[in-house]
Structure formats: C-alpha cells, structure tokens
Amino acid sequence: MITRSRCRRSLLWFLVFHGGATATGAPSGGKELSQTPTWAVAVVCTFLILISHLLEKGLQRLANWLWKKHKNSLLEALEKIKAELMILGFISLLLTFGEPYILKICVPRKAALSMLPCLSEDTVLFQKLAPSSLSRHLLAAGDTSINCKQGSEPLITLKGLHQLHILLFFLAIFHIVYSLITMMLSRLKIRGWKKWEQETLSNDYEFSIDHSRLRLTHETSFVREHTSFWTTTPFFFYVGCFFRQFFVSVERTDYLTLRHGFISAHLAPGRKFNFQRYIKRSLEDDFKLVVGISPVLWASFVIFLLFNVNGWRTLFWASIPPLLIILAVGTKLQAIMATMALEIVETHAVVQGMPLVQGSDRYFWFDCPQLLLHLIHFALFQNAFQITHFFWIWYSFGLKSCFHKDFNLVVSKLFLCLGALILCSYITLPLYALVTQMGSHMKKAVFDEQMAKALKKWHKDIKLKKGKARKLPSKTLGVSESFSLSSSSSATTLHRSKTTGHSSNIIYYKQEDEEDEMSDLEAGAEDAIDRIQQQEMQFHNS
C-alpha cells in the first residue's frame, strides 16, 4: 500500500514538472541536448528533482496533519487536488508527445484566419498576401515546422502550443488558490457564529425555548425579521430577499431558530450538540466538490476559448454570469428562511417557546439542496478562470496587448470578479451551509469514522442476538450522504415529524470538567444506539 502511494506521488510530480518544464517558454532553435554541457543538464535535473521532492513532502505532511486532526473531508479534498494535478500532468504529456503530430495538421488558409481572438497588424498583412508570400513570411519569422501545401496553414504553431500549455497550468493553479481563499473566508464567517452557540448554554436560552412560555407568533424575533408588508407580494418578496443578503445575511435569531429546528427534527431532547461545529464540518465536506474540476467545467473552459473572438467582448460578458448565479443563489437562500417564517405565521397564532421551523427539500429548486452547491461550484470556477485569463494574457502578451484594447472594460471585469469572490465566500457559501441543514435529511458530516464503526458494531450485535429467525421490523443503519434510522413506531424515528406549534424543551447542562464533556459526535452516536436498544426492548415485550 505504501509502495503504491509513493509510486502514485512520484508519477504525479513527474507529470506536473515534466509539463511545467516544457511549458515555461517558447522553444528556440538552439543546441540539442547532445551539444549541451553535462553540468548544465545535471543542474537543471537536480533543481527539478529537489523542488518536486520538497512539494511532495509538504503535501504529505499536510495530509498527515489532517489525518491526525480527523479532518477527513479536507483530506479527501487534498486527494482531489492531487488528482487534478495528475490530470493536468497527463494533458501536459499529451501536448508534449503529440506536438510533432499536431504541428503537421494543416487547415485551409480561410479557416485559419477566421474567428481570431486578436486581430493584429500582421494578421491584416497576412490576409492581403498571396499564399506563396504568406508561406515565405512565416518561414522568415522562424516557424520552420510548417510543411503545409500552398493555400493551407498549420492548425496551431509551436509557439501557440506552448502558450496553451501555460494557460492550462495557470488555470489549475489559480483554481486551487481561488478555492482555498474561498474556504478560508467562509470558515472565518462561520467562526463568528461561535458566540451564538455558546449562548445556548445559558439560562436565558433555556427560558427562551421553554414550551410553557406562550407568545404570539408575529412577536417572535425570527418572524419579525423575515415578515413585513413586502412579503405579501411575490415581486417585493424576492426584491427584499435580494437586498437582505448584502446587509444581514445571517442574524442571531436566524442561527438560533434554525439550530432549534434542526435539533428538534434529528436529535433527541436533552442532548448536547455543537451546531456551529457541525456546520463547519458540513462546509468542509462540501469543499471536496468545490475544489474539483468536473468534465462540465472543462467543457465550459473550451466553449469560452471557442467564442473568445475579436470584437465579441467575450472576456467581459463571461464575467457577468458567475456574479448573477451567486446573487440568485443568495436570494433563494434568503427566500427559504422567509418562507419558513411565513408558514409559521399562517399555521399558528401562538407558539410555545421558540418557533419551530419545518425544514424540507421542497423549499429548494427541484427539491434538490445539492443543486445550489453545484451552481456555486460553477460560478467559482468561471470566476477563477476570468482571473486566470487576465494574468495569463499579462504574462504571455503583456498588460496592454491587443486582448486588452479597452482597458477600462478589463478593470471593470476584475472588479466584478473580486466582488463575486467576496460575496460568495463571506456571504453566500456560509448561508448555504446553514440553510441547507433545513433539508429533509441529516448530512453525514455529523459522524466521524469512530462513530461509524460504533454504529455498525451495534447493528451487528443486534443481528446476532435476534438470530436468523428473528428480525427487527425496520432498521436502516450506516453512514451515507443522509443518515436515516427509522422504525415502524413513530416514537423511535429520526425523520422529521409534523409540529403542532410547540417546541420540545431541550435542556443543556454545563460540564465542570471540559475533558469529561461528551462531544457532539459521540452524543449523536449514543442517541442512535439508545434508539436501537429501545427497539430491541419493544420487540421483546411484544
């Protein structure tokens, strides 16, 4: 196993640095390797080997640290980053070894001069030259690999192939860096909710959720914040939700109300549960998707290259959809909270304790909360690509090249990308991590490997006790994307149940010794185990 892992890492860095070495610059007609001093070859090889070895050890130390800290989701995200780098290395190898064959592909001259991204003076001159003069002009420019017949041109030149090589490396590196910045800002936002979580240990919070305390529904803080005169009209409802995400994306009442609804639906009363830590783990679990580059995203990258034609202003127009997607997702998330508040008002005139929100997948587009994450992922990739393209143009052609004729438009595009980064990282993604907990199922981020083993062990013990002739009425146990533990008895279910307008009286105890405090994960596991034991006792009594 260790040998396979080392071989994989060695292959990864060979692919990456082999491609990086071939993509660092345009080739020249200098001496071959047989005419190069041996000391020069040895120095270059030593440099590449040392750098690759240091990076490999750095990633390995990071992986070991994540494993010791039980950051399994981030560890999987790191493995996905390695996989993306390996894909990049394979693309690099294909470009390198396929270079002689790609350069031999010729296309008609008319096709070669169509859909150009940059119409330079040389291109205008080429369009006026005769085919024979065009070939002589290209040969004089140093492109000696052209062997096309009269009236044809190479599909892509050697210099263009190396510039494309550099673009692919820029894309992979900037996407990873962009994703890391997004994750850091999101975690910073969620860290600010820790003070709200600590409030749940106070006596004031216990009083606020006391079911013996009657209040009018419209007087509760959550309902007041999300219902007003503008919520009665659909148009103003969404306009209000749109602007709300910029000023008060998540308030204290939002966090405490959604936390109360989540615990009432998925956990037993009286259990200690760190909801803020659970959201942080859930965000880390979603990061595995955000950091990857799917075939759909690669296809969007190719489509952009296809339509990046001179005069179409593709660079500017392509920077608008990511921002619109992020704004639409943020508006939808705010609308979900407002809808839950409206349903409380329509259903109950009086509530006991804290309002109990009823979460469901029906609040989300196509009953799929995961769709919002895919939209965020697409917007982040497109935004990262816009920034990548800007720096690639600057590196390869210069800041004031023909790609940046309208420099004011370029600056506007960069501000849009920066605004989308801040909006998505600090507002939309944390809001998504909170609101999607109101779906129909609990995410697996609440469980770690130790808990999964404990649950499976209990499952196995119960099956052994029952024997082949006896079987529980209904048991579904395991760790998956949505954890479910159901029974024929309505009293022993982890699924969301209908409310009558009052909430459970959840009591929290402060522990004097922090070391003896049961973690939220252990509490969730013990809760599931208790329910299994109850099922077993009910079965024996019957």
Curated annotation (Swiss-Prot):
Its main location: membrane. One of its GO terms (biological process) is defense response. GO terms for molecular function: calmodulin binding. Residues 1-38, 104-165, 310-315, 396-414 are extracellular. It comes from the Eukaryota. Restricted to pollen, synergids, pistils and immature anthers. Also detected in seedlings, leaves, stems and inflorescens. The chain crosses the membrane at residues 39-59, 83-103, 166-186, 289-309, 316-336, 375-395, 415-435. InterPro entries: Mlo. The C-terminus contains a calmodulin-binding domain, which binds calmodulin in a calcium-dependent fashion. This is MLO-like protein 7. It comes from Arabidopsis thaliana (Mouse-ear cress).
